[in-house]
Amino acid sequence: MEKKLSSEKNQLSSEHILGLLPHRYPFALVDKVIENIPGERAVAVKNVTLNEPQFQGHFPERPLMPGVLIVESMAQVGGIIVTQMPDLPKGLFVFAGINNVKFRKPVVPGDQLIISCELLSIKRQRFGKVKGEAYVDGNLVCAGELMFSLVD
């Protein structure tokens, strides 16, 4: 029973996420955080639904989640990690780059993305690097390194 209570404390609701990230509809791509170690790692959920605007044109006959939005969802989970670091200056951390991103399987409406990110480094209190992975049904669909920068 105690383990369950402690794990629930490490979860973040959509309302809490809205307090950490500046993203709003239609670009808020994290539904909830199911594991959170502030400043170290986070695991989040993104439920992919046919009602999302990108599926009107990507592709109407065979809807696929655009790879850039999978990467953006990983970046938002990385942003949750970075924004909870106590010693960093306050400000807007933005997505600054990607390395070695690979897409392995398509993501379609009805899928649930499980996004896992881990902080790799912080430099000069303004640049961060995160390792991100996205899974559907336990299968890796995307992985790579994401960089962040503090905007003055």
UniProtKB/Swiss-Prot annotation:
Protein encoded by which gene: fabZ
GO CC annotation: cytoplasm; membrane
Keyword set, alphabetical order: Cytoplasm, Lipid A biosynthesis, Lipid biosynthesis, Lipid metabolism, Lyase
Protein family according to the UniProt entry: Belongs to the thioester dehydratase family. FabZ subfamily.
Name of the protein described by the UniProt record: 3-hydroxyacyl-[acyl-carrier-protein] dehydratase FabZ
Keyword Membrane: no
Role, per record: Involved in unsaturated fatty acids biosynthesis. Catalyzes the dehydration of short chain beta-hydroxyacyl-ACPs and long chain saturated and unsaturated beta-hydroxyacyl-ACPs.
Active-site residues, as the UniProt record annotates them: H58
Localization, UniProt: Cytoplasm
Origin: domain of life: Bacteria
GO biological process: fatty acid biosynthetic process; lipid A biosynthetic process
Catalysed reactions listed for this entry: a (3R)-hydroxyacyl-[ACP] = a (2E)-enoyl-[ACP] + H2O
Molecular function terms from GO: (3R)-hydroxyacyl-[acyl-carrier-protein] dehydratase activity
Pfam families the UniProt entry points to: FabA
CDD domains registered for this protein in UniProt: FabZ
NCBIfam families associated with the record: fabZ, PRK00006.1
